[in-house]
């Protein structure tokens, strides 16, 4: 039985040195009045470092300066069955382009991972709001050199069915949205997905894999425009405590633009947040992520799959790529609560459920709402450590369980959703 185990060992001295060098940025980080809270009574990892290494504590408060940028950096080493030992450096940049009423926080998130199995993982995710909130700019750029496990199509596969594949991957997705009404934006963009050096490394001998049956080619290209309708009433996307998010995205892939084939995809995503109890800082969060493909045949590696959303977070409790199919339905709920009243430590409990189009319907290209495989649930719990009390960036460490013996640790800089 393959068990997905991921353990991160943090490097406090390096983390502390990076964060203390950023304290000048912290002290000038100005929280807009509509987002302000009593930061003097809140504590984060930088405050802990100050209390240990500084004789005289320097209050980190709003100075009213124009600079409103904060950087959180997290170096770590990790281990998983999929990566072996890995060196990881994550960074989260949060800032406001203005202090007007209703101004949203802008974020830039990146990391670099190099693993024992010579995997390279380099994502860059941006969510930038203009000064007046009229425009929103989103980017999802990734480069991967990624030997990894795949398990076939549908949700009736077993962990023992997994085998290694290898490929290189470049994703460049860019989108710009314009405000239509309050919190409502319409947008368009351009997507490029390029795979090369695709190969199977350890398939069962004498058995044709789902990958081969579906279509295994050494190179795959998908190019096309994207059209989106976005509603976002959250004020802080790093650690939301209220508001909601709804994204409807249509992405056709077109041969005349350079795609290998014509096909289409539709994404319907919802996130909602509510304080519970209402007078507390505890939050109930709900996430629904649903992807559908139609009008052609997507590459195997671009089919909806566990853990392949833009933030690589669906399916806690399951290894990335555990399930795959033409269509995907996903639902997750999480309860976030304080452990310490100063906000330094928190906790979560979560549960999720996912289903995909079955193997035969995906292979035959006739998937519909009637051809979904059995639902696969997951659940777990985690801790939160406040890295920055101004941007509300948390270090998130979760342990999840899934069906069929799946289990593992998930680590994030910023909330999972």
Regions from the language model: what does each represent?
Residues 1-28:
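Bacterial Sec-dependent N-terminal signal peptides
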Residues 24-60, 140-142, 148-283, 356-360, ...:
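Transmembrane beta-strand segments of outer-membrane beta-barrel domains in Gram-negative
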Residues 57-69, 97-105, 131-136, 182-183, ...:
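Short loop/turn motifs that connect adjacent beta-strands in outer-membrane beta-barrel proteins
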Residues 63-73, 77-221, 321-322, 392-407, ...:
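Gram-negative/organellar outer-membrane beta-barrel architecture
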Residues 75-77, 89-93, 124-128, 172-178, ...:
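Residues on the lipid-exposed face of transmembrane beta-strands in outer-membrane beta-barrel proteins
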Residues 236-345, 350:
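C-terminal outer-membrane beta-barrel translocator/porin domains of Gram-negative envelope proteins
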Residues 318-324, 365-373, 400-401:
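Short, contiguous acidic/charged loop-to-helix segments that flank catalytic cores in large enzymes
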Residues 339-378:
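C-terminal hydrophobic structural anchor segments
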């Amino acid at each position: 039985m393959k068990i997905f185990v991921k353990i991160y060992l943090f490097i406090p001295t390096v983390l502390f040195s990076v964060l203390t060098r950023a304290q000048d940025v912290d002290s000038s980080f100005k929280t807009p009045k509509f987002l302000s809270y009593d930061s003097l009574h809140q504590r984060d990892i930088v405050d802990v470092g100050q209390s240990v290494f500084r004789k005289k504590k320097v209050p980190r408060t709003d100075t009213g300066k124009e600079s409103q940028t904060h950087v959180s950096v997290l170096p770590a080493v990790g281990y998983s069955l999929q990566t072996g030992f890995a060196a990881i450096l994550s960074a989260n940049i949060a800032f406001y382009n203005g202090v007007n009423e209703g101004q949203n926080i802008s974020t830039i998130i990146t990391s670099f991972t190099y693993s024992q199995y010579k995997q390279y993982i380099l994502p860059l995710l941006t969510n930038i709001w203009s000064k007046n909130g009229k425009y929103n700019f989103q980017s999802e750029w990734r480069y991967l050199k990624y030997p990894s496990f795949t398990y076939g199509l549908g949700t009736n596969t077993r962990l023992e069915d997994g085998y290694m594949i290898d490929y290189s991957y470049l994703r460049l997705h860019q989108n710009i949205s314009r405000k239509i009404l309050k919190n409502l934006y319409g947008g368009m963009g351009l997507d490029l997905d390029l795979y090369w050096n695709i190969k199977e490394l350890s398939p069962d001998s004498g058995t044709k894999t789902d990958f081969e049956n579906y279509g295994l080619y050494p190179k795959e290209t998908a190019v096309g425009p994207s059209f989106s309708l976005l509603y976002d009433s959250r004020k802080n996307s790093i650690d939301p405590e209220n508001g909601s998010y709804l994204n409807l995205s249509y992405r056709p892939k077109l041969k005349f633009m350079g795609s290998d084939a014509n096909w289409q995809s539709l994404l319907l995503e919802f996130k909602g947040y509510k304080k519970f109890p209402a007078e507390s800082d505890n939050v109930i969060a709900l996430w629904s992520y649903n992807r559908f493909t139609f009008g052609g045949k997507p590459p195997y590696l671009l089919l909806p799959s566990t853990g392949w959303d833009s933030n690589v977070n669906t399916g806690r409790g399951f290894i990335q790529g555990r399930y795959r199919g033409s269509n995907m339905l996903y639902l997750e709920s999480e309860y976030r609560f304080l452990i310490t009243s100063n906000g330094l430590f928190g906790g979560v409990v979560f549960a999720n459920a996912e289903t995909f189009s079955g193997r035969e319907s995906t292979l035959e290209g006739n998937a519909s709402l009637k051809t979904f495989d059995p639902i696969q649930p997951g659940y777990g719990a985690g801790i939160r450590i406040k890295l920055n009390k101004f941007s509300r960036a948390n270090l998130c460490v979760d342990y999840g369980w899934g069906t069929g013996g799946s289990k593992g640790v998930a680590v994030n800089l910023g909330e999972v959703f």
